[in-house]
């Protein structure tokens, strides 16, 4: 079984966002991805290289500009999506909902009550 920590989960979620952005536009430059996601160019480049090594995207240069495009391998993208679905429930649900607020929060301390 694969173990995940908070950083690896965030990295996978970020790579999924990058993949979605590229898929919506078919081809994007690394600098445009950086600007769109408000990330440093170095961070985007590191994640693009990982996605390239894993076979999700293809990187190529035109002049001094680095571009990324989605490879035609829907199976690997489906595997990534299924892995991330497991994290959805963990990160998407608030710790306490309005109805689950502990009753102690609503009570006044005996020292603050006057009467």
From Swiss-Prot:
Keyword terms of this UniProt record: DNA-binding, Transcription, Transcription regulation
Domain HTH arsR-type: 1-91
DNA-binding region: 30-53
Record has Cytoplasm as a keyword: no
Single GO MF annotation: DNA-binding transcription factor activity
Highest taxon above the source species: Viruses
Cross-referenced SMART domains: HTH_ARSR (SM00418)
Keyword Kinase tagged: no
Database matches in InterPro entries: ArsR-like_HTH (IPR011991), HTH_ArsR_DNA-bd_dom (IPR001845), WH-like_DNA-bd_sf (IPR036388), WH_DNA-bd_sf (IPR036390)
Function of the molecule: Essential for virus function.
Name by which UniProt lists this protein: Uncharacterized HTH-type transcriptional regulator B-115
Annotated source species: Sulfolobus spindle-shape virus 1
Lineage: Viruses, Viruses incertae sedis, Fuselloviridae, Alphafusellovirus
